[in-house]
A protein has these predicted regions:
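Walker A (P-loop) phosphate-binding motif
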Residues: 13-53
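Conserved catalytic-core segment of NTP-binding enzymes
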Residues: 114, 149-165, 174, 179, ...
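General beta-strand structural signal in soluble alpha/beta enzymes
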Residues: 33, 58-62, 140-143, 180-184, ...
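Solvent-exposed alpha-helices and their adjacent loops that cap or buttress functional pockets
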Residues: 22-26, 124, 128-134, 168-174, ...
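Residue-level preference for the first positions of well-ordered beta-strands
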Residues: 28-32, 56-58, 136-140, 177-181, ...
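N-terminal phosphate/diphosphate-binding loop that engages ATP/GTP or pyrophosphate donors
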Residues: 47-139, 143
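Short, glycine/acidic-enriched capping/hinge loops at junctions between secondary-structure elements
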Residues: 43-45, 68-72, 151-152, 222
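N-terminal pre-Walker A segment at the start of P-loop NTPase domains
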Residues: 2-17
Length: 310
């Protein structure tokens, strides 16, 4: 039996959009995404949905992420890139050691520019004239660009800076809703992870925290599909080459030092189980076992499923 109070939803983007847009007028929702196996795809997909709904999405990672691409392609191409976890946005704003207020003022100027910004990914001037917002934008904020092979990375902002940006935006009373999307940890493209002592970097102002797991981790050796496998093996009390079971995955997702560590008490906690389409019919029981293992005291408020067959 499923635990009362847990909602299982398959249309995950629509559900998250509903939760974000249910916030009162003037409130700037903040979503933090943690875990592995689809964080970047979630952020990219949400930014597209926000734009379609007339809202401005502000990607403000608190960790390093791959550099997004300019939103100069067609909506169809942007959607395809999002499904690959590649973010496309209108502009990049870098803090580069400046004060939080300076970054906030630049952000306000961009959000309130009548003609929007050029559809190219370049740091904007530190000073811009403030007019009225005319269209929804997707912006990316970060500290600095770090050269990295094969793709450069963007070093994120501190959780404290992100919360100060949120407070600043709420005082501005923008005519379009702005939503902060925070990628709060990295997983080196693995579908599951064990979190180190400094992770995740969840802002104290987060309204929603979504912990992501890729279901393609189930049944495979821990050493090959888990980010920081040694740490995971230690926490689980298994060998490095033990196959990942549903109970093991649930233990990592709900561990006190796992993806929800540092979540504000007022925030809604959501688990997103990604890639349901990778499970063949004979593995359907694995998903059922994982859902049951997540339905425990202290478990998530909601479980969302995603995959081409969901």
């Amino acid at each position: 039996m499923l635990r009362a109070g847990v909602i299982i939803v398959q249309q995950f983007l629509s559900r998250i959009m509903d939760l974000l847009c249910a916030c009162p007028p003037g409130h700037v929702p903040c979503l933090a995404v943690t875990g592995a196996g689809g964080k970047s795809s979630l952020a990219a997909g949400l930014s597209i949905h926000l734009s379609k709904a007339g809202h401005s999405g502000i990607i403000a990672p608190s960790t390093r992420i791959y550099m997004p691409r300019p939103r100069s392609c067609s909506p169809e191409e942007a959607q395809r890139l999002a499904e690959c976890g590649i973010q496309t946005c209108d502009a990049l704003l870098l803090r580069r050691g400046r004060s939080d207020r300076a970054l906030s003022e630049e952000l306000r100027a961009v959000l309130c520019t009548m003609d929007g910004v050029p559809r190219r990914l370049l740091p904007l001037p530190e000073k811009s004239s403030a007019l009225c917002p005319n269209r929804a934008l997707c912006l990316v904020l970060g500290e600095e660009v770090v050269r990295h092979s094969p793709r450069s990375k963007l070093r994120g902002l501190s959780p404290e800076t992100i919360c100060r940006l949120k407070q600043f935006l709420e005082k501005e009373k923008l005519s379009r809703r702005a939503v902060l999307l925070v990628e709060a940890d990295g997983a080196a493209r693995h579908p599951l992870k064990a979190h180190a002592a400094h992770e995740p970097q969840i802002p104290s102002c987060a309204d929603l925290v979504v912990a992501v797991m890729g279901l393609d981790a189930l049944g495979k050796p821990l050493a090959t599909v888990v980010h920081r496998p040694e740490l995971a093996a230690e926490r689980l009390g298994v060998t490095l080459y033990a196959p990942v079971t549903p109970r093991m995955a649930a233990t990592l997702l709900l561990h006190e030092e796992g993806p929800f560590r540092g979540t504000p008490s007022s925030a809604r906690r959501i688990v997103l189980l990604n890639k349901t389409d990778v499970l063949d019919p004979s593995q359907g029981k694995l998903l059922d076992e994982l859902l049951e293992s997540l339905h425990v005291p202290g478990g998530p408020d909601e479980i969302l499923l995603h995959g081409n067959n969901a």
